[in-house]
């Protein structure tokens, strides 16, 4: 069965219930949340996340598996500012607790940025941070995300992710989130040779570690190292390649999460594309008028 959904918002008093309601309105059977704003560390207590009501709604709507994404501000690759590193370690520990409480198994993490110290120093610092965070007892896996290589990001290549995994003591608590836009922008040819890319991933990291897919088109050509998401079928990856990935038999059991941009010229009135993109991928048929239809208020 195809597991497909999108990033949804967990906010207000409803929190997890609101997230599940939004996902169900898109026809999704999985979804991804941030436990608070991705740009800061302000978080509600576990008791305020409305977990029980959210889980009941999920069960009633056939949503079994959800994913949590750690905030962007965590940087355990920072060797120059140890306060930033320590904040990342402490916050990641708390985020694992929240993820466990919600009942999610995967916590997606941007590995980190070396901020000028060099890739090797950044990778070693990420290993150090993960070794401080991970415990034998935890059930949650941290899913290291494949990165585009923008700025000083670490994790652009499969080899870099494998290096991190190999250096971590409890690396059974590590998995990988494969982002289509990021891997494309990092230089992997997922358009013409996705099977070859998947074989390379399996050889270097192992397909058994692949636990989350972020399905995004890209505004930029392959190898641009930009990381700018585009709506499904309207970018440089294209619908055919993304549809092939979404329905790939080796990836059937992996949740596929859309993080494509909201649609509209008016910044204050942009519309989510997810209901339409999910339907399009389920039908395996591209609608080149989709963005106009969403703009026009298509239900």
From Swiss-Prot:
Catalytic activity, as annotated: Endonucleolytic cleavage to 5'-phosphooligonucleotide end-products
CDD domains listed in its UniProt record: AP2Ec
HAMAP family (alphabetical): Nfo
Native species: Geobacillus kaustophilus (strain HTA426)
Binding site for Zn(2+) 1: 69, 110, 145
Keywords linked to the UniProt accession: DNA damage, DNA repair, Endonuclease, Hydrolase, Metal-binding, Nuclease, Zinc
SUPFAM superfamilies associated with the record: Xylose isomerase-like
A GO BP annotation: base-excision repair
SMART domains: AP2Ec
Role of this protein: Endonuclease IV plays a role in DNA repair. It cleaves phosphodiester bonds at apurinic or apyrimidinic (AP) sites, generating a 3'-hydroxyl group and a 5'-terminal sugar phosphate.
Keyword Ribonucleoprotein found: no
Signal peptide location: none
Enzyme class, first EC level, given as a word: hydrolase
PROSITE patterns on file: AP_NUCLEASE_F2_1, AP_NUCLEASE_F2_2, AP_NUCLEASE_F2_3, AP_NUCLEASE_F2_4
Enzyme Commission number, as recorded: 3.1.21.2
Protein name: Probable endonuclease 4
Lineage of the organism: Bacteria, Bacillati, Bacillota, Bacilli, Bacillales
Pfam families, sorted: AP_endonuc_2
Annotated GO MF terms: deoxyribonuclease IV (phage-T4-induced) activity; DNA binding; DNA-(apurinic or apyrimidinic site) endonuclease activity; phosphoric diester hydrolase activity; zinc ion binding
Cofactor or coenzyme needed: Zn(2+)
Gene name in the database record: nfo
Cofactor binding description: Binds 3 Zn(2+) ions.
Protein family membership: Belongs to the AP endonuclease 2 family.
Keyword flag Lipid metabolism: no
Xref: InterPro entries: AP_endonuc_2, AP_endonuc_F2_Zn_BS, Xyl_isomerase-like_sf, Xyl_isomerase-like_TIM-brl
